[in-house]
């Protein structure tokens, strides 16, 4: 995965409006074409600018191990978990909004993989 696909999968800024977090996840997973053949089990959208998230790979993050970095700051995000449906267009998600720190993988100072939401 590269920086542009990371942005498509994980960055939504400013946050797309939806009637509720579940509807938000259903909409975004479809709009970003993240379920081409099967419903993705889980996906997190971060509501911060690409430059803010990119900083986690540098001064805005703390090295964890290998190429993984933990953000120093918390980000507004929506965590989407699959609860059924069928790909590509009717996957159903349970969305949970929150403000949390994140762990990402970096290559050449750019985020390339979303590892997890830190509790």
Swiss-Prot record:
Modified residues (Pyrrolidone carboxylic acid): 1
Predominant location category: secreted
Cystine pairs: 25-80, 39-91, 57-106
CDD domains listed in its UniProt record: RNase_A_canonical
Keyword Nuclease listed: yes
Compartment(s): Secreted
Gene Ontology MF terms in the entry: lyase activity; nucleic acid binding; ribonuclease A activity
Keywords from the named record: Disulfide bond, Endonuclease, Hydrolase, Lyase, Nuclease, Pyrrolidone carboxylic acid, Secreted
Active site: residue positions: 10, 113
Stored Gene3D superfamilies: Ribonuclease A-like domain
Claim: Hydrolase is one of the keywords in the record: yes
Catalytic activity: an [RNA] containing cytidine + H2O = an [RNA]-3'-cytidine-3'-phosphate + a 5'-hydroxy-ribonucleotide-3'-[RNA]; an [RNA] containing uridine + H2O = an [RNA]-3'-uridine-3'-phosphate + a 5'-hydroxy-ribonucleotide-3'-[RNA]
Binding-site residues for substrate, renumbered to this chain: 40-44
GO terms for cellular component: extracellular region
SUPFAM superfamilies: RNase A-like
Expression across tissues: Pancreas.
Family classification: Belongs to the pancreatic ribonuclease family.
Function: Endonuclease that catalyzes the cleavage of RNA on the 3' side of pyrimidine nucleotides. Acts on single-stranded and double-stranded RNA.
Assembly description: Monomer. Interacts with and forms tight 1:1 complexes with RNH1. Dimerization of two such complexes may occur. Interaction with RNH1 inhibits this protein.
Name of the protein: Ribonuclease pancreatic
């Amino acid at each position: 995965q590269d920086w542009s696909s990371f942005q498509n999968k994980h960055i939504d800024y400013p946050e797309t409006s939806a009637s509720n977090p579940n509807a938000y996840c259903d909409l975004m997973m479809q709009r970003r074409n993240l379920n081409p053949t099967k419903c993705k089990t889980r996906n997190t959208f971060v509501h911060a600018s690409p430059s803010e998230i990119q900083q986690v790979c540098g001064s805005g993050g703390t090295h964890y191990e290998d190429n993984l970095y933990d953000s120093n700051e918390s980000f507004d995000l929506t965590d989407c978990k699959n609860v059924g449906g069928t790909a590509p267009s009717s996957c159903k998600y349970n969305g949970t909004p929150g403000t949390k720190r994140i762990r990402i993988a970096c290559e050449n100072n750019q985020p390339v993989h979303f590892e997890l939401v830190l509790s």
